Amino acid sequence: KAVLAFDKLDTKFPVIMKTLRGSKGVGVLFVESEKSLDSIVQLIYKQDEDTDLLLQEYIPTDYDVRVLVLGGKVLATMKRPVIEGDFRSNVSQGSKPEKIKLTELEIEESLKAAKAVNGVWTAVDFIPSKNREKEPPFVIEVNSSPGTEGMEEASGQNISKEIIEFFADKKNWVKV
């Protein structure tokens, strides 16, 4: 199954494999070959055959960007440099967050990604394109229960306060 999924990606190794239940960079794997892909999938399914897996094209980068979206607006952003000796950029894994200003295109694409999952409170993670002004970023993940670790440090904002104030306002409540 994994090899069939890889073939549909229309890419080359290495690829990124993610378990859909992971967080903070746990369950994210760098897969270098078909043999490795097969072995990793066998190991994961031996532990839990109901584990959902996602394969993504590997895009080399020095950093990714996390965008917190709240109520259809960008709340805060941070640049997450790739950890030395690793391919991940999660703050929980050791990345040191930095401030970043998004382009209009990056804002537009982040809001579009959040809207695609009907997210009121989401984080959109992306790898910026080479030409940030003219080419859309590569969205790599949209989180419906986002971590905010490092965001206050990078943005200088009181994220928790802003989230509480948003949801305390009844006009922002969503009917279910």
Indicate residue ranges for each PLM-predicted region:
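Phosphate-binding site of ATP-dependent enzymes
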Residues: 24-113, 117
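Protein kinase-like catalytic core scaffold
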Residues: 15, 73-76, 122, 138-141
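A conserved helix-loop-beta module that forms one wall/lid of the active-site cleft
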Residues: 1-27
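C-terminal active-site "lid" helix and adjoining low-complexity regulatory extension at the edge
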Residues: 101, 115, 128-176
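Short, structured loop/turn "capping" segments at alpha-beta junctions
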Residues: 13-17, 47-54, 120, 174
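A short glycine-rich, hydrophobically flanked beta-strand micro-motif that places a catalytic Asp/Glu
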Residues: 56, 119-131
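A short beta-turn/loop motif at secondary-structure boundaries
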Residues: 22, 58-61, 129-134
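Conserved protein-kinase catalytic-loop segment immediately C-terminal to the catalytic Asp
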Residues: 16, 68, 127-130
